[in-house]
Amino acid sequence: MSSKPEPKDVHQLNGTGPSASPCSSDGPGREPLAGTSEFLGPDGAGVEVVIESRANAKGVREEDALLENGSQSNESDDVSTDRGPAPPSPLKETSFSIGLQVLFPFLLAGFGTVAAGMVLDIVQHWEVFQKVTEVFILVPALLGLKGNLEMTLASRLSTAANIGHMDTPKELWRMITGNMALIQVQATVVGFLASIAAVVFGWIPDGHFSIPHAFLLCASSVATAFIASLVLGMIMIGVIIGSRKIGINPDNVATPIAASLGDLITLALLSGISWGLYLELNHWRYIYPLVCAFFVALLPVWVVLARRSPATREVLYSGWEPVIIAMAISSVGGLILDKTVSDPNFAGMAVFTPVINGVGGNLVAVQASRISTFLHMNGMPGENSEQAPRRCPSPCTTFFSPDVNSRSARVLFLLVVPGHLVFLYTISCMQGGHTTLTLIFIIFYMTAALLQVLILLYIADWMVHWMWGRGLDPDNFSIPYLTALGDLLGTGLLALSFHVLWLIGDRDTDVGD
């Protein structure tokens, strides 16, 4: 819709398309148009709206299925009594209200990443991790599902809740079943692919291949991905519904909670399932292919359920590209981590990597979800050129403009330093890692964290609008890329910080010992 109406432009109010009646406009300098219809304004007065007859031939695009149910209403001659509901207005938020709503989930997410690091420090000494070392390769791939699936689910459901597509029981049930079925399909497929990657990467270095170990990895990966997605999906649905009922913007709380629980639950499940299956390695080996076959056999059921919902049908067919590419990006970050911590001088980096990666991914996921919700409230993907700038925005526009998205970017950026100070202090109190929290270390660590989040927030501002302009729903496509970039930037900048610290002489007996 153009911002400068001219004769024969198409006008539409509240997503309603009433039938046109022949009439001509008597406004000054305006030629007769195809037809007009009357609407009731906010004060009850009649408002005459000009409608071009050819507008009725315009269909709804498939990739905008999420908005499909709310963008059209039944035509009626009596539009005053048979109009579609007005689209909900965005919540009025100040910087203080945004910060207040984000703070608790942000801290919860950070403590979740700290807990996940502590769990990994314990389970790495279990026999299954010592004998089947390829399980370590599964860790970053399965933890990446948090950004690829759960956080995308949280963003998608938050947008649906904010634009009124979960207000009735029928809409709510359809949205829940479709999205839960969708993430089960994605989790099963990604879990299977992750196990194949683990087998290949474990075989390449020494040329050793074990069929029982391969089945163990496949069963552990698929079962972990399936159960983790099921549990986290149910939690996300409860959080979003509860947030909407008490007047909190779900965009501010859903994605951080998904992140906080995602790492911990996924890592705990992977450790427990792989350990339990490993105990049966020498007795019931046939249980491994049976577990794999069971979850694969459920795929057709989830596909049928996901196809029934317009909100997930398009994602089922086109939502695989970001998931696969995000795994590749995260793998590069994993390669940096592997090469860095394998050097005894930098072994202390391991405990901080989940924290810096998790915090950056959580903050950018909140911002991406908020921008996507704002765009959905103002139109449909690909149809509003004003919402999709052709060029990259300037940093001043991203962080210092008066609009609500710039305000939220400033709030999220200001949370980085106090949040990381709390998490570093927690790690120190729990005696995690091998690094003394000296002043110079904290300065380098904070510099890396601030630079990571600054880059991510800027990329999110550009990427979400760019995807919107190309007709892609940012809820489905942006967050996997952004969280994967967060892993890559966080790991790379942290590794660079440790190398610089070593070069300038910060080599006390604790750093990297």
From Swiss-Prot:
GO cellular component: basolateral plasma membrane; plasma membrane; protein-containing complex
Chain intervals with Basic and acidic residues compositional bias: 1-11
Domain of life from the UniProt record: Eukaryota
Effect caused by changing residue 350 to V: Increased magnesium ion transmembrane transporter activity; no effect on plasma membrane localization
Annotated GO MF terms: inorganic cation transmembrane transporter activity; magnesium ion transmembrane transporter activity; magnesium:sodium antiporter activity; transmembrane transporter activity
Tissue/organ expression: Highest expression levels in heart and testis, slightly less in skeletal muscles, prostate, adrenal gland and thyroid, and weakest in the hematopoietic tissues bones marrow, lymph node, thymus and spleen. In the kidney, it is expressed in the distal convoluted tubules, macula densa, and thick ascending limb tubular segments of the nephrons.
InterPro entries the record matches: SLC41_membr_dom (IPR006667), SLC41_membr_dom_sf (IPR036739), SLC41A1-3 (IPR045349)
Polar residues composition-biased segments: 13-24
Compartments, record wording: Cell membrane; Basolateral cell membrane
Disease: Nephronophthisis-like nephropathy 2: A disorder with features of nephronophthisis, a cystic kidney disease leading to end-stage renal failure. Nephronophthisis is histologically characterized by modifications of the tubules with thickening of the basement membrane, interstitial fibrosis and, in the advanced stages, medullary cysts. Typical clinical manifestation are chronic renal failure, anemia, polyuria, polydipsia, isosthenuria, and growth retardation. Associations with extrarenal symptoms are frequent.
Protein name per UniProt: Solute carrier family 41 member 1
Organism lineage: Eukaryota, Metazoa, Chordata, Craniata, Vertebrata
